[in-house]
Amino acid sequence: MVYCIGHTIISPLGEGSQANLEAVQAGRSGLKLYTHRFADVEPFCASLFDTPQSFVPLCIKSVEDAITNYQLQITNSKDTVFILSTTKGDNLDLITPAKTIAQHFGNPNAPIVVSNACTSGVCAQITAMRLLEAGLYRHAIVVGCDIQSRFIVSGFQSFKALSPEPCKPFSPDRQGLNLGEAAATIIYSQQPMANSQQPLWTLEAGSIHNDANHLSAPSRTGEGAYQCLKDVMEGITADQIALVGVHGTATMYNDAMETIALERAGLQDVPKSVLKPFFGHTMGAAGVVETILCAMQANKMVNDQMVNDQMVNVIKMLSGFGGVNAAIRLRCE
């Protein structure tokens, strides 16, 4: 178990975790139609920053906002490790931007890059938990980010995977996913933040499975996702879970697979959080962005007495190309 001591989100919906949560609660979506964003690319629906962003500066701002908001002074410590979650970055050698980010903050340790398709943000948090629980570091700064490009958009278009309109996860008439841009940071520690008044969370469990089914299609039985859910639910039951943050891409096969996995795990009646209609698929940032918002949603449920004290667990699950599946369980107070 490790403690979240800080977090932030930067997206087209706003800067800061609270601003993004309020946008979601108000039903505001960042999705819109782009006709001339990239040369020689067909019109597409996505959630992009109005002003094109650069990858490294956006990551740096995300970390700076998180440490400033929570008045943390840990970035240049030998007890702190930086973990970058991204699927594309801005360089074929992803360790280069990771080093630039860590060096900006004067951190003496070699950063870690987690690039595991759409599950990267959850896998990065699992990596942080394992490093802290092993006693290798006291703090881990997990930053997730991806910026869209002509290469990415045209690639998904070639798969016929993009919806021409805002996505509709789990709808019978869903047409595919929308892409998105964001940067988000979660800071984990071996110990809780002293005198914290913030309703943060603990990271209790994590699991990664590969279903070895297909390079770009999930298991039709949801096997990998089910095994992840089974692992993170060890020691608890479905009635102790307040919320499940699903992947919910609105692609035909992913949503069908997730539905099967959730039912196999006995989670079909637990409330779900589906965030792609607000942010699009932010790829390497998705697991970080959506973990923060799921935890904040669950904290609000607890504060509003919508759930009892026993229902304080939150599960966040993701799946990705290559057959990878990942899930984590948080405990919110």
Predicted regions and their residues:
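Short acidic, glycine/proline-enriched helix-loop-strand junctions
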Residues: 153-162
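Short conserved active-site loop signatures built around small residues
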Residues: 121
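Conserved "HGTGT" condensation-loop signature of ketosynthase/thiolase-family condensing enzymes
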Residues: 1-111, 149, 162-178, 184-186, ...
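Short acidic donor-binding loop at the edge of a beta-strand
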Residues: 138-139, 313
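Short acidic/polar active-site loop segments enriched in Thr and Asp
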Residues: 137-138, 242
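Active-site alpha-helical elements of protease catalytic centers
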Residues: 124-125, 187
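Alpha-helix C-terminal capping segments
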Residues: 104, 129-136, 296-297
